């Protein structure tokens, strides 16, 4: 692309010039880049910011565009500008034409339009005040137009006689004419929208370099790198440093830079008798040595946009002290990577300096945090986002106009799908970034939480970034607050736009259930599925009539690089048989035990009791804890039964039969049930305030439990690590087994089973006697399901996933001599194709072939029934049209499917490849068999599948000869 960056000057000191040069240096590697300037009073000096020789610099003769003769019109425009700057007289929508002409005369505009169109640029970017002028020209330019803000909203609109002072009405008319207006922070985005009604897009400035060398945290030197102008607050700095020097006689202050206020500030230092402590360096081409010889960076600015010097300071490991103005709190994490004293309070600024200067450990800690934080501002991320914007503008201009209605429908109907696809296609994978999700964002719990805590405790993983997916920020407030101080821990709202970005760009993905159907794993990503329990009740395709509902989970497991298993029983029951991964799963099953069970080998009793207390559950230390932890009931996981009377009846039974001087009861409902009854619980009597929130980890709770009462939940397997009693309460056994199914008969359980409350009450009256006959069975099941639980599961799994260490107990499912067939038979509405497929299944030798059917149309009752009736010897992957695709791909795919063409358009090849991967993971098939002649999604997509041959309904019998 041919890109022009238009600014007033470039070979001059200042953050804008620096970041423009930085971006241009990267863009010129892929594009033709010109920097156009017309007020640069300096000669060309590419060494100032190491400008690439490949960048063209176009020095504009401004006199060609502007008539500076003192004609009446010139004098009138001058008067209009002065009156408006003083009183805002012309800052009104009805007078926009007058003020616009005064700022940018029509004849001047005409010359600029002619000149810019002659250059044949694809994209024109303007900085600062020139964005308004570009907005005036935009409708007549051939190029796409982008305005680029380099200061905060207040710095542009609220500082007298600067940039857009008293020009709000002009901004409201002309900025929307730009194709994009870029701001530096979410605060600016909010203010432009709220105050001016202008839609903007955020792109932060990147760091300008990467340094292997870091500062010396022991150095007793402060550093400023700045321009000597009013906005930078050097007068405030002198006042604060004078106060600092009264309490300290060692630290020095180096100030790099120059400017109009140089003499004034130097004189101020002498007047305050601190000139021997301040080193006025002036301009330098070697700022690195000053960063390396300092340990704290100071920024007392009155206003800032997104200061480059902060990113530079972080890269060298310098914590930053800055006044809390603008977007500073989005860059500096207060008390983690620096301090943010109240704006312009020099006393608090001096106090922050003293605190960092006199606390060596705090300075070292903040230095490490600053280095971590620097990763957020990598130039690669910024360039990728800019390139994505360029491609979007160029690609979508014509395409959008031609397909506007269809695109808007896609964005409205498929917002999450299109957003995910955009991030997958356009954004790079972020190395050393780990995403954790448990039960759809319920909280920091289960196996993902155990792995997170392990990684956070190890020095070797200190430079990793951690992203936690959270559904309810209020419920998880305590944990969020706890980790706020860690700059490498971030929380993202479940099913938000940021969530789409996170699951699409994080290098490592850890989930204990499954990601949504619009998730498409990339080849560069590493997916660890930890699952969340050893099977007791039926799961996966073993559940009668639940095949369709299990489709997304099966797809997630097939996409996982690693799946965690508690042992051989779980591997065979859950993964090999229930989800039918045998023969086609290309990842590794890690039989290393559940990470969450490491909690049984740690003594965290007081910490867990503290969490319960803060939730309003006050347990007595001298009493044993009985925990009731039932599973969920109902036909659908998303809408479980929430009838509480059965729970309350159990509470009464327990309390009536236990010795209340020795025992106390708490209840941990299943994650999904708790969220559905949370509001109901709030209305119950306080005596029932024993329900443990879903945000508290179950295994932390089990570790302090003395007696477990379970039903059909798999938590009892984990609890066996404690060697403490477990009782089972099955008042609805026949109904539950009929609707769901169980892998274990009651007589094989490691504890007594009560079918009614009276029997349960009897067990509770003498627990020791009740469990005595089950001791041998208890030990047998424990040896089977807890074989690898030794307190080191997290360590083994982390070594395999993050270090590439060979797993200690790997299981592979892809070793088979069977011929693997991937079949498609449509929705079975066509009788001929349905008969063909039935005949195929009857004819094929299941001992020689492994058959996977892509099931579609399952939302149709008859089709769903047909799929359920198929032989259990074949594997059905249920495909639903919830695929992630860009709006362009949606529209092009729809157009292609309606056409008579059979040749897949090149622009859809990536989409079809992604969708096949989403459905089958890394599974490898030998042949494809398609039993329909209709032009449907899978037959079209199958043309891009790498197999030996594709058979059809006409020649499928040849498969039998293989």
List where the protein language model places each region.
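Aromatic "clamp/platform" in nucleotide-sugar-dependent glycosyltransferases that forms part
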Residues: 283, 302
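A short, well-ordered alpha-helix in the C-terminal region of glycosyltransferases
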Residues: 348, 355, 362-376, 384-388, ...
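Membrane-proximal helix-turn-helix segments that form the acceptor-binding/catalytic region
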Residues: 110-117, 162-181, 498-500, 548-563, ...
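Conserved acidic donor-binding segment of nucleotide-sugar-dependent glycosyltransferases
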Residues: 334-335, 339-346, 355-360, 752-756
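Conserved donor-binding/catalytic core segment of Leloir-type glycosyltransferases
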Residues: 4, 182, 215-232, 238-241, ...
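Donor nucleotide-sugar binding/catalytic pocket of nucleotide-sugar-dependent glycosyltransferases
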Residues: 144-147, 154, 170-211, 584-598, ...
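Short hydrophobic beta-strand element within catalytic cores of glycosyltransferases
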Residues: 310, 319-322, 332, 708-709, ...
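Conserved catalytic-core segment of nucleotide-activated headgroup transferases in glycan assembly
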Residues: 230-257, 446-452, 595-679, 833-837
């Amino acid at each position: 692309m041919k890109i022009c960056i238009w600014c007033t000057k470039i070979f001059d000191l200042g953050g804008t010039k620096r970041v423009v040069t930085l971006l241009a240096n990267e863009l010129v590697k892929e594009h033709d880049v010109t920097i156009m300037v017309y007020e640069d009073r300096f000669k060309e000096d590419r060494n100032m910011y190491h400008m690439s020789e490949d960048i063209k610099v176009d020095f504009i003769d401004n006199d060609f565009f502007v008539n500076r003769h003192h004609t009446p019109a010139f004098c009138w425009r001058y008067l209009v500008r002065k009156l408006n700057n003083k009183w805002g007289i012309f800052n009104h929508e009805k007078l926009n034409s007058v003020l616009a002409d005064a700022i940018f005369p029509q004849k001047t505009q005409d010359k600029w339009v002619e000149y810019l169109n002659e250059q044949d640029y694809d994209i024109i970017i303007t900085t600062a005040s020139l964005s308004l002028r570009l907005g005036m020209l935009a409708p007549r330019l051939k190029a796409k137009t982008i305005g680029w803000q380099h200061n905060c909203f207040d710095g542009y609109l609220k500082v007298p006689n600067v940039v857009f002072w008293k020009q709000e009405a002009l901004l409201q008319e002309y900025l929307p004419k730009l194709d994009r207006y870029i701001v530096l922070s979410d605060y600016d985005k909010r203010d432009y929208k709220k105050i001016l009604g202008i839609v903007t897009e955020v792109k932060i400035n990147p760091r300008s370099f990467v340094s292997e060398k870091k500062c010396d945290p022991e150095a007793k030197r402060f550093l400023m790198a700045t321009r000597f102008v009013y906005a930078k607050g050097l007068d405030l700095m002198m006042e604060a440093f004078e106060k600092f020097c009264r309490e300290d006689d060692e630290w020095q202050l180096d100030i790099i830079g120059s400017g109009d206020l140089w003499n004034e500030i130097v004189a101020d230092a002498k007047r305050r008798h601190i000139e021997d402590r301040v080193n006025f360096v002036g301009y330098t081409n070697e700022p690195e040595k000053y960063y390396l010889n300092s340990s704290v960076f100071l920024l007392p600015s009155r206003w800032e946009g997104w200061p480059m010097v902060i990113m530079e300071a972080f890269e060298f490991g310098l914590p930053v002290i800055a006044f809390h103005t603008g977007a500073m709190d989005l860059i500096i994490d207060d008390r983690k990577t620096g301090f943010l004293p109240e704006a312009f309070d020099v006393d608090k600024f001096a106090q922050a300096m003293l605190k960092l200067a006199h606390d060596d450990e705090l300075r070292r800690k903040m230095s490490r945090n600053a280095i971590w934080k620097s990763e957020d501002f990598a130039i690669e991320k910024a360039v990728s986002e800019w390139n994505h914007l360029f491609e979007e503008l160029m690609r979508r201009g014509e395409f959008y106009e031609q397909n506007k209605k269809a695109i808007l429908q896609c964005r409205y109907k498929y917002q999450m799908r299109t957003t995910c696809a955009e991030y997958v296609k356009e954004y790079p994978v972020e190395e050393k970034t780990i995403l954790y999700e448990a039960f759809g964002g319920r909280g920091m719990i289960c196996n993902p939480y155990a792995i997170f805590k392990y990684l956070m405790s190890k020095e070797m993983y200190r430079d990793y970034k951690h992203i936690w997916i959270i559904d309810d920020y209020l419920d998880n407030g305590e944990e969020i607050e706890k980790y706020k101080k860690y700059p490498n821990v971030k929380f993202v709202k479940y099913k938000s736009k940021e969530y789409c970005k996170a699951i699409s760009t994080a290098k490592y993905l850890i989930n204990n259930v499954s990601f949504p159907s619009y998730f498409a794993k990339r080849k560069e990503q590493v997916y660890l599925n930890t699952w969340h329990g050893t099977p007791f009740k039926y799961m996966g395709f073993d559940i009668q009539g639940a095949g369709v509902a299990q489709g997304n989970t099966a797809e997630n497991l097939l996409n996982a690089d690693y799946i965690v298993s508690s042992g051989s029983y779980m591997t065979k029951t859950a993964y090999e048989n229930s989800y039918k991964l045998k023969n086609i799963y290309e990842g590794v099953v890690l039989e290393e035990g559940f990470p969450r069970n490491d909690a049984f080998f740690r003594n965290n009793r007081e910490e867990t009791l503290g969490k319960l207390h803060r939730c309003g559950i006050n347990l007595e230390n001298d009493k044993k804890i009985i925990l009731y932890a039932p599973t969920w009931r109902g036909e659908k996981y998303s809408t479980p039964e929430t009838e509480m009377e059965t729970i309350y009846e159990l509470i009464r039974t327990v309390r009536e039969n236990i010795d209340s001087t020795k025992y106390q009861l708490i209840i941990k409902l299943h994650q999904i049930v708790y969220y559905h009854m949370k509001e109901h619980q709030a209305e119950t009597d306080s005596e029932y305030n024993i329900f443990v929130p879903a945000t508290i980890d179950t295994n932390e709770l089990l570790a302090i439990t003395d007696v477990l009462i379970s039903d059909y939940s798999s938590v009892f397997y984990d609890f066996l690590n404690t060697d403490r009693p477990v009782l089972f309460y099955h008042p609805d056994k026949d109904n539950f087994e009929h609707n769901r199914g169980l892998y274990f008969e009651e007589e094989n359980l490691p504890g007594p089973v009560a079918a009614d409350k009276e029997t349960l009450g009897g067990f509770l009256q003498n627990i020791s006697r009740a469990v005595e006959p089950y001791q041998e069975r208890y030990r047998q099941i424990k040896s089977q399901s807890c074989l690898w639980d030794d307190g080191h599961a997290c360590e083994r799994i982390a070594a395999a996933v993050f270090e590439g260490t060979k797993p200690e107990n790997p299981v592979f499912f892809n070793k088979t001599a069977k011929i693997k067939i991937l079949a498609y038979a449509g929705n079975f509405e066509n009788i001929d194709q349905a008969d063909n497929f039935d005949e195929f299944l009857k004819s094929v030798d299941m001992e020689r072939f492994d058959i996977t059917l892509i099931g579609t149309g399952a939302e149709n009752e008859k089709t769903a029934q047909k799929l359920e009736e198929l032989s259990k010897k074949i594997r059905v992957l249920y495909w639903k049209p919830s695929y992630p695709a860009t709006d362009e791909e949606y529209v092009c795919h729809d157009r292609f499917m309606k056409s008579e063409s059979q040749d897949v358009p090149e622009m859809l090849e990536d989409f079809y490849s992604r969708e096949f991967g989403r459905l089958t993971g890394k599974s490898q098939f030998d042949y494809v068999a398609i039993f329909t002649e209709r032009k449907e999604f899978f037959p079209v997509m199958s043309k891009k599948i790498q197999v030996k041959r594709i058979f059809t309904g006409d020649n499928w019998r040849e498969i039998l000869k293989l």
